[in-house]
């Protein structure tokens, strides 16, 4: 109120001076006649000029068709009859903002009209006027963005149409856009193919390499069939690749492949000088074992023939060899591949050095064709034990592979008895290398020095002594195989029991989680209802408190 009174006093004095200004001039009369004419126009013109300059620039001060409503801040008591009385909180309609005096507006309040000072009133907030402008700007912004984006996407089509329509030459103009259109999709397709189809192209290249390697191996095997003397030297490169892959992947099909290829190569130069009939039989075994398309089912007869030769030729070496092979294969997996490589490198030295190879290495003591069955069975044992020790969770795939190998080993046992009577009368009288193989393990087992036995190699007179001793060796090898199969079955049973326990635990955990989810879903609406009830209760309490006050 003190500020309003201070502001009112100078304004009231000014309006009084302005209203009484003519009386003072008339009182002076003729005393100031010379001064009056220049003073009166100057005193009248400045307010006109000030009104013109004051009215023209701002638009909000002009009269508007829709009158504004202002709220009164301070009480105002009129001092002149044309002034309007104001009370705090009243609403005043502004009729005009241009009046004779600066800072005075004309308005209407409670059915009365008059002039009032503008600083006693608050105009409506300008935010209300700006709200529609902001909404329009927000709506127009995405429209502009879409307009900007559309021409970019349609630029290539527009350029093609313009190039096709504007060019006067018929043949030339038609050739250029078609050439561009043919070039562009090729570039795009190449680019997209390199970016998007980068993944599937790489396996294609790898597949082509593997096909080339398979073709190379097949061609090398055909060359071996044509020239048996040069066979071992050419087969050095494909066999280490085949032996490295099974060590990493542990696939049952690829493991016996190098053994099958290397088995018939060792006896080829040994048996070639003795008779001409034997290489023909060996070529048939090469065809069976060397083809890259052979599967496990196709390789069973080759293994059976190998087992028949072993059963016929060796008396006491079979159980010893099995005992020697088992610990090394259980500990080291990569030794058979290295030993097979040694078998392939050794034949270059000559036929006299070949009997020396069985003495230092245990895997090479197997004369040619007996190695694949213990390798496959014992490697499966290694896999099963590794699964028990380190990774019990990875079980289903390996159980299936172990069972397949077990079934695979059981089938040759039944076939061995049938094929013994057929294989022995054909090969034993013709092959004279049998006693040579029998002499080697008997003398090389106690002493590794074999040069004394090399002179005894060409003696072919001990062949008939093998016939009565063959049934003695077969039950031992069968018993060993049955022991291996029983151990495999026991390990598979243990794995299955562990898997069943894991399944039970997982089912229990899943059941617990499912029950927790159900309880949460049941509790969530109850919690929401409780929260709503609390809010409504608090709201009712606040209402009652306000009513009591």
From Swiss-Prot:
Extent of Polar residues compositional bias? 41-54, 343-365, 439-456
Q: Which SMART domains match?
A: SH3 (SM00326)
Which residue ranges does the record assign to the SH3 domain? 65-126
What sections of the sequence does the record tag as coiled-coil? 482-510
The answer to whether the entry has keyword Coiled coil is: yes
Name of protein:
SH3 domain-containing protein 21
Q: Per its UniProt record, what Pfam families does this chain match?
A: SH3_2
Regions of biased composition (Basic and acidic residues) lie at 267-280, 332-342
Q: Which InterPro entries match?
A: Endophilin_SH3RF (IPR050384), SH3-like_dom_sf (IPR036028), SH3_domain (IPR001452), SH3D21_SH3 (IPR035468)
- Which species is this UniProt entry from? Mus musculus
The membrane spanning regions, by residue number, are none
Instruction: List every stretch annotated Disordered.
Output: 1-56, 142-303, 332-479, 528-549
The highest taxon in the source lineage is Eukaryota
Give the signal peptide, or none: none
Q: Which UniProt keywords apply?
A: Coiled coil, SH3 domain
Low complexity: compositionally biased ranges: 211-220
Protein encoded by which gene: Sh3d21
């Amino acid at each position: 109120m003190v500020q309003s009174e201070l502001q009112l006093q100078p304004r009231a004095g000014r309006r009084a001076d302005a209203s009484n200004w003519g009386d003072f001039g008339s009182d002076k009369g003729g005393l100031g006649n010379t001064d009056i004419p220049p003073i009166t126009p100057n005193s009248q013109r400045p307010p006109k000029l000030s009104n013109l300059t004051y009215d023209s620039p701002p638009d909000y001060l002009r009269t508007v068709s829709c009158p504004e409503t202002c709220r009164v801040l301070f009480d105002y008591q009129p001092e002149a009859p044309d002034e309007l009385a104001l009370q705090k909180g009243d609403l005043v309609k502004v009729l005009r903002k241009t009046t004779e005096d600066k800072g005075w507006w004309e308005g209407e309040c409670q059915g009365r009209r008059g002039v009032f000072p503008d600083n006693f009133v608050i105009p409506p907030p300008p935010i209300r006027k700006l709200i529609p402008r902001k909404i329009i700007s927000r709506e127009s912004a995405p429209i502009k963005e879409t307009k900007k984006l559309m021409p970019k996407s349609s630029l290539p089509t527009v350029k093609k149409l313009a190039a096709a329509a504007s060019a006067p030459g018929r043949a030339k103009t038609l050739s250029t856009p078609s050439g561009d259109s043919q070039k562009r999709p090729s570039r795009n397709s190449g680019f997209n193919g390199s970016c998007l189809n980068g993944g599937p192209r790489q396996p294609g290249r790898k597949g082509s390499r593997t096909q080339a390697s398979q073709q190379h191996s097949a061609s090398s095997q055909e060359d071996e069939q044509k020239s048996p003397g040069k066979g071992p030297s050419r087969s050095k490169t494909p066999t280490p690749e085949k032996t490295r892959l099974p060590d990493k992947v542990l696939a049952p099909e690829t493991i016996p492949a190098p053994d099958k290829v290397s088995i018939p190569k060792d006896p080829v130069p040994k048996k070639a000088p003795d008779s001409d009939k034997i290489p023909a039989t060996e070529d048939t075994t090469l065809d069976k074992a060397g083809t890259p398309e052979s599967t496990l089912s196709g390789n069973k007869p080759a293994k059976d023939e190998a087992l028949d030769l072993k059963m016929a030729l060796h008396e006491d070496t079979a159980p010893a060899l099995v005992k020697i092979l088992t610990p090394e294969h259980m500990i080291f997996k990569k030794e058979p591949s290295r030993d097979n490589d040694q078998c392939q490198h050794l034949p270059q030295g000559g036929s006299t050095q070949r009997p020396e190879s069985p003495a230092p290495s245990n895997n090479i003591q197997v004369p040619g064709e007996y190695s694949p069955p213990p390798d496959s069975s014992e490697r499966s044992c290694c896999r099963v034990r590794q699964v028990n020790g380190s990774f019990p969770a990875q079980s289903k795939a390996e159980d299936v592979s172990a069972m397949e190998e077990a079934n695979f080993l059981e089938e040759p046992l039944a076939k061995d008895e049938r094929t013994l009577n057929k294989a022995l009368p054909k090969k034993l009288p013709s092959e004279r290398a049998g006693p040579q193989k029998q002499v080697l393990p008997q003398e090389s087992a106690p002493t590794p020095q074999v040069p004394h036995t090399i002179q005894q190699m060409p003696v072919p007179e001990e062949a008939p002594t093998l016939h009565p001793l063959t049934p003695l060796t077969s039950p031992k090898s069968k018993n060993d195989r049955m022991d291996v199969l029983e151990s495999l079955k026991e390990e598979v049973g243990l794995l299955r029991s562990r898997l069943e326990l894991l399944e039970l635990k997982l089912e229990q955990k899943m059941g617990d989680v499912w029950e927790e989810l159900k309880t949460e879903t049941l509790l969530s609406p109850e919690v929401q209802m409780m929260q709503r009830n609390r809010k409504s209760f608090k709201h009712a309490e606040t209402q009652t408190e306000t009513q009591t006050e």
